[in-house]
Amino acid sequence: MTALKHTPLNAAHRALNARMVDFGGWDMPVNYGSQIEEHEAVRTDAGMFDVSHMCVVDFTGSRARAFFEYAIANNVGKLKTPGKALYSCLLNPQGGVIDDLIVYYFTEDFFRVVVNAGTADKDIAWFNQLNEQGGYGLTIAPRRDFAIVAVQGPNAREKVWATVPAARAATSELKPFNAAQVAGTPFGDLTVARTGYTGEDGFEVIVPAVHVEALWNALQQHGVRPCGLGARDTLRLEAGMNLYGQDMDDTVSPLDAGLAWTVDLSTPRAFVGREALERDGTRAAFVGLILQKENGKAGGVLRAHQKVVTPHGEGEITSGTFSPSMQESIAFARVPTAVQVGDTVHVQIRDKQLPARVVKLPFVRNGKVLAA
C-alpha cells in the first residue's frame, strides 16, 4: 500500500483534531468538528482551506503564449494584463477533459498554472509531450516548494489584509480572476489571487511551503475558521462548480459538463480537442436538480450515480448533497438535451422514483440563494 502524501499543514490539521481522510492519495482534513458550521463560516464570515495538494506549475519561455493557445480550450488572448487569470479545460484529442485548471499570465515569457492534485502527474506529462512535439522550448517546472491556502467568505479579504498588511495595497483594487505578487511579507513572497471554489469572494494565497504554517496560524488568530473537504464540497456544489473526476473526466466533453462557457470556438485558433468538439457538439444537458418535498419532507438525499428518469430518456446524477444554505437536497445531473429548466424529472433513490425539479445553476452565489 502506497503511503499517503502530506501537505505542509498536515501537523497543523492534526493539532486541530481534524478528521483526516484519503483524498486521491493525500491525507486531508474532511472537517474539524461541525461541517455545517464550517460551511456557514464561509457563507457569512471567513473560512480557510488547505489546498496545498493542488500543484503549481510554472511555464517560462518566449513561446509560452503560443503554447497555451494550442494546449487549452479557452482563449489566452483574453490574458492581456499581468496577473489576469483564466479558467479552462485541458482536453485530449477526443475532446475529453484531462483536467480543469487556472492559468495565470504574468509576462509574455512567464505563465503559472494551478492543476488538480489527482491529475497533476498526468497533466505535467501531457504538457511536456505538447511542449516537445510542438518545439515550444518552454521550461515546465512543478513547484512543490509552494503551498496554497484558500481564504473564502464575505470578510475573507479584510481578514487577509489584517494578517498580511503588505497585501492590501497590492490587492485592494484587484478584480475577480486576477492575481498580484506581494513581495517581502513575513510569510515570504506571495501570489494572492481573487479566485476560489465556494461561490464567495476571497483570495487563494500561494505561499512558500516553509511559511505556510505561520500564515495558517496567523489567519486563525485573525478569526478565519479552518474548514475541511466536507464544507468545500457542499459550498462548491451550491456554487455550481464542477469537481474533476466526478462531474467530468477524460471521457466527457466540456460541452456535456456545463463548461461550454470555458471553450472558445469564436476564433479559428487550433487547439487540442477542437475537431472532436465541433464534430460531436453537445450531446447532453448539464443541469441542477432540487429534490421535491412531500408534506414538507424530502424522501432522501441526491447522490452521485443515481439514475434520472425523464420523458426524453435516462440521465445520471454526477454530484449530489444536502445544501446547508437551502435546506434542500441538490444535485448536478447529465440528462438528455431536451430536458428544460422548470421540468420535473424522477430520481431513482433505492426502490423509489422521487420527483426533482430542474433548475439553472448555480444554486447559491455570494450568500444568496438563486435557484428557487
Swiss-Prot record:
Pfam families given in the database record: GCV_T, GCV_T_C
Keyword Transferase: yes
Catalytic activity: N(6)-[(R)-S(8)-aminomethyldihydrolipoyl]-L-lysyl-[protein] + (6S)-5,6,7,8-tetrahydrofolate = N(6)-[(R)-dihydrolipoyl]-L-lysyl-[protein] + (6R)-5,10-methylene-5,6,7,8-tetrahydrofolate + NH4(+)
EC primary class: transferase
GO biological process, one term: glycine decarboxylation via glycine cleavage system
Keyword Transferase: yes
Superkingdom field: Bacteria
GO molecular function, one term: transaminase activity
InterPro entries tied to this protein: GCS_T, GCS_T_bac, GCST_C, GCV_T_N, GcvT/YgfZ/DmdA, GcvT/YgfZ_C, TrmE/GcvT_dom1
Recorded GO CC terms: cytosol; glycine cleavage complex
EC numbers on record: 2.1.2.10
Keywords linked to the UniProt accession: Aminotransferase, Transferase
Assembly and interaction partners: The glycine cleavage system is composed of four proteins: P, T, L and H.
Primary role: The glycine cleavage system catalyzes the degradation of glycine.
Family membership noted in the UniProt record: Belongs to the GcvT family.
Protein name as it appears in the record: Aminomethyltransferase
Organism the protein comes from: Burkholderia multivorans (strain ATCC 17616 / 249)
